[in-house]
Every structure is written in structure tokens, then in C-alpha cells.
Amino acid sequence: VHLTGEEKSGLTALWAKVNVEEIGGEALGRLLVVYPWTQRFFEHFGDLSTADAVMKNPKVKKHGQKVLASFGEGLKHLDNLKGTFATLSELHCDKLHVDPENFRLLGNVLVVVLARHFGKEFTPELQTAYQKVVAGVANALAHKYH
């Protein structure tokens, strides 16, 4: 991912304020609501029958936190996203058979959730930087598929 020094410092400063549990759960929940076909990977999470059920589901929240913690690790290794996500790419490709397009969708949902939580602080410049990173992470997670 090619970022300017200003973009990197902006990403880091905002990320330090992110509540990984809250934003991770909301991002994954929104993915499952807006793109319901993604629920097939999470049938073992229990009730996903309504938007309210998804957003309140503790397993969705917990897994969202795990996903966002991994994303945070990626932010520490922007120069080696493929290496950072190699094991997760293999897991999602070989064992879970997740459509790699879902990584892009989740990245876009994450940007929306960050914008919702941070309002005016989430400037167009920060959005640009986060869009670059989520695209890079999605590409790294899809790497094993190629």
C-alpha cells in the first residue's frame, strides 16, 4: 500500500481512538445485514434472522472484534500485508472457502462505520487513506486464491 507520511500518521492517530470491540462488531454485523449471503459462513453463530438479531448477536460482536484486531495488525505492517495475512488467506481460501469479494465488501463497510463513529474527524483525506488500506488488506487476504 502506497501511503504518504501524512496518511500514515493520520491512520495511526485515528486507529488509536478506535474501540475494536464496538467497531468490529458493528462492521461485521452490518456486512451480514447488508450482504445477507455472507451469513452462510456464520450459520453456527445462532440467530441471524433479522438486522436486530445480527447486531445484538454476541458471537458476531466477538468475531468482529477478532477481525478488527487482525486489521489493526495489518496497520502495523503496511509494507508487508501479504505476509501479515498469509495464514488468514490460506484459512479463508482452503478451509472456509470464503469468496474473496467478501473481504472488499467488509473493508468498505468498515470505512462507513469509521465515518459514522468519528464524524467530521474522519476527513476525506483519512477516508482516502483507509480506502487504500482496506483495499490492500482485501488483496492480501485474497492472495492465496490467485
UniProtKB/Swiss-Prot annotation:
One function term, GO molecular function aspect: organic acid binding
Top-rank lineage group of the source organism: Eukaryota
Tissues where the protein occurs: Red blood cells.
GO cellular component, one term: haptoglobin-hemoglobin complex
Binding site for heme b: 63, 92
UniProt record, GO biological process: hydrogen peroxide catabolic process
Function: Involved in oxygen transport from the lung to the various peripheral tissues.
Quaternary data: Heterotetramer of two alpha chains and two beta chains.
Name used for this protein in its record: Hemoglobin subunit beta-1/2
Organism: Physeter macrocephalus (Sperm whale)
Primary gene name: HBB
